[in-house]
């Protein structure tokens, strides 16, 4: 699928070295911008990416046939979204979750392209991010995501949870 000057396709095994490089670039960017804790030095682990690829839920964003971004789009209930503190999800219906979105800095509009792609699969989306990830929080708010509350990973670490509904953004925009 092509969105603006970016194309989105399922990631394939030969993409893995470049995808790993993109995540390394993203971790360095996050650390340099005060968010070293969200992904640390190893997240996402290669095993997670291999599982995402095997399940057909890892996507490569390309510009002129070169990978510039990556994200996972996951269908079904996310167990970490069962408990939410300080708020509520705006809807209780099937959703897609955007996880592990990252770019290598060579293209603009990766998040917007990911959002347009995800909207083709569902009118209701969820995502979470670390409170120190100011860049992602800005992108979420700029693109019509609404803050819902705090969710917790298995290890107890909190994340800010957001959702997006095509209907609510169409009415307000």
Model regions and ranges:
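Conserved beta-strand in the GNAT
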Residues: 60, 66-76
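Conserved GNAT-fold acetyl-CoA-binding loop/helix
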Residues: 27-47
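Conserved acyl-donor/pantetheine-binding loop and adjacent beta-alpha core of acyl/acetyltransferases
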Residues: 72-106
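Conserved active-site alpha-helix within GNAT-family acetyltransferase domains
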Residues: 112, 132-149, 157
């Amino acid at each position: 699928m092509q969105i603006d000057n970016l194309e989105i396709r399922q990631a394939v095994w030969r993409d893995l070295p470049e995808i790993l490089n993109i995540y390394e670039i993203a971790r360095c960017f996050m650390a340099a911008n005060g968010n070293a804790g969200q992904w640390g030095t190893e997240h996402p682990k290669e095993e997670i990416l291999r599982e995402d690829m095997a399940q057909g839920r890892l996507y490569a964003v390309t510009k002129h046939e070169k990978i510039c971004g990556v994200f996972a789009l996951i269908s079904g209930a996310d167990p970490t979204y069962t408990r939410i503190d300080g708020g509520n999800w705006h809807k209780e219906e099937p959703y897609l979750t955007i996880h592990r979105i990252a770019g290598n800095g060579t293209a603009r509009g990766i998040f917007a392209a990911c959002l347009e792609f995800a909207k083709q699969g569902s009118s209701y989306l969820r995502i979470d991010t670390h409170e120190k990830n100011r860049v992602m929080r800005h992108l979420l708010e700029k693109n019509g995501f609404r803050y819902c509350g705090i969710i917790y990973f298995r290890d107890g670490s909190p994340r800010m949870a957001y959702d997006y509904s095509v209907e609510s953004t169409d009415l307000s925009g």
